[in-house]
A protein has these predicted regions:
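Short, charged, surface-exposed loops that flank catalytic or proteolytic processing sites
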Residues: 3, 239, 259-271
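Extracellular/periplasmic periplasmic-binding protein-like sensory domains
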Residues: 170-246, 328-329, 339-340
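Short beta-strand elements in bilobed, periplasmic/extracellular small-molecule ligand-binding domains
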Residues: 1-13, 69-71, 119-136
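Periplasmic-binding protein-like
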Residues: 26-38, 58-60, 99-101, 150-166, ...
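An alpha-beta-alpha
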Residues: 75-131
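Solvent-exposed, acidic/polar segments of extracytosolic/periplasmic ligand-binding ectodomains
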Residues: 281-345
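Extracellular/periplasmic bilobed ligand-binding domains
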Residues: 115-116, 120-211
Length: 345
């Protein structure tokens, strides 16, 4: 492409108070494009700064939706690309009784709301919703309640160490009662990725369902090239994931748009980005929707195995249009935003 980027890397270390400080630092040095943020709280912290400086935040993470900014390019999955496909799969293959467990945080609140409305619209039920403080690692009472209720599945929106510990405790509690947890009370998530499987540990790593647009197990030349390059760049890990792929896609889309525009001016870049930039990404073809500035992505369902990888269970036949506000679905969540997935295993 003839484009050479000089990255300016600042690490807030997960400290929310540092995001606005570091973002201001970059923006006042005339940095016009930032690929970054993971949590919704960090994204919301810095968006006003990008709007003030008329710069672009390239946000490379799946998220809960119901947001739009002319200064953000969303390369991760919107809710119709991860929550609704998971609901479709769970209701079709596991049952209609859900139990929600999440962190007391916007990611869990919104995803549980979407799942609740979608499940109840299809004559299902949500038996309970339990929320825990970020970082909580004691789930004994909640797990006892889940086992007593015997839901068709658990929808897990805990994040970080809380999620890892829940998987371990839940598997152990089920095993002690002779319950085959992965088959009888499967746990489903929209944020479980390969590096997190390694963090869970081998005793509880297998049999969990994840809804994502990318898994390392995708068989394609583009993904093989990505994984080879990733391993060369990060030989010590962590393993590639949906967030790594979304970041990779963001940089390539940015580079192509800058090359086409002949400038890094954010407005010119956005014009070229939506005009012609289709990327042969590791997950398949990716491009940006000109109305929402979210990405067309390919939803998939994976089931974790003992090798801390995912076996593909189903996938959409083609990239799905992003619908961050779910405006294209009917009141019963039965229309275009719940893409039909084909079984692959």
């Amino acid at each position: 492409l003839g484009i050479h980027f000089e990255p300016s890397i600042l690490n807030p270390g997960g400290d929310l108070s540092q995001y606005s400080t570091l973002a201001t630092n970059m923006l006042e040095r005339d940095v016009r494009h930032v690929v970054g943020c993971y949590t919704s709280s960090s994204r919301k912290e810095v968006i006003p700064l990008f709007e003030k400086h008329d710069a672009l935040l390239w946000y490379p993470s799946h998220y809960e939706g119901f947001e739009s900014s002319t200064n953000v390019i969303y390369t991760g999955a919107a809710p119709n690309q991860h929550v609704l496909p998971l609901v479709e799969h769970l209701l079709a293959h596991h049952g209609h009784r859900a139990y929600c467990v999440g962190s007391n945080y916007i990611w869990a609140w919104e995803n549980n709301r979407i799942l609740r409305e979608s499940v109840t619209a299809r004559q299902g039920s949500v038996l309970a919703e339990r929320y825990f403080a970020l970082g909580e690692t004691v789930f004994h009472q909640a797990i006892e309640a889940i086992i007593e209720a015997r839901p068709s599945f658990v929808f897990l929106t805990l994040i970080g160490t809380s999620a890892y510990q829940f998987f371990r405790e839940f598997r152990m509690a089920c095993r002690a009662r002779g319950i085959e947890q992965a088959r009888e009370i499967p746990v489903a998530s929209c944020s479980l990725s390969e590096p997190e499987l390694q963090a869970i540990g081998e005793d509880a790593v297998d049999g969990h369902l994840s809804s994502s647009v990318y898994f390392c197990s995708i068989e394609s030349p583009a993904n093989r090239r990505f994984l080879d390059a990733y391993l060369t760049r990060f030989p010590e890990g962590p393993t590639a994931s949906a967030d790594a792929e979304a970041s990779y896609n963001a940089v390539w889309l940015l580079a192509r748009a800058v090359a086409a525009a002949g400038t890094d001016d954010p407005r010119a870049v956005k014009t070229e980005l939506v005009r012609q930039q289709h990327l042969d990404a590791p997950q398949g073809e990716v491009w940006i929707d000109e109305q929402t500035f979210h990405a067309y992505l390919t939803p998939r369902i994976g089931r974790s195995n003992r090798n801390a990888r995912f076996d593909l269970v189903s996938e959409a036949r083609a990239p799905v249009r992003p619908d961050p506000y779910l405006v294209h679905s009917s009141s019963r969540f039965e229309a275009a935003t719940a893409p039909s997935l084909r079984l692959v295993s």
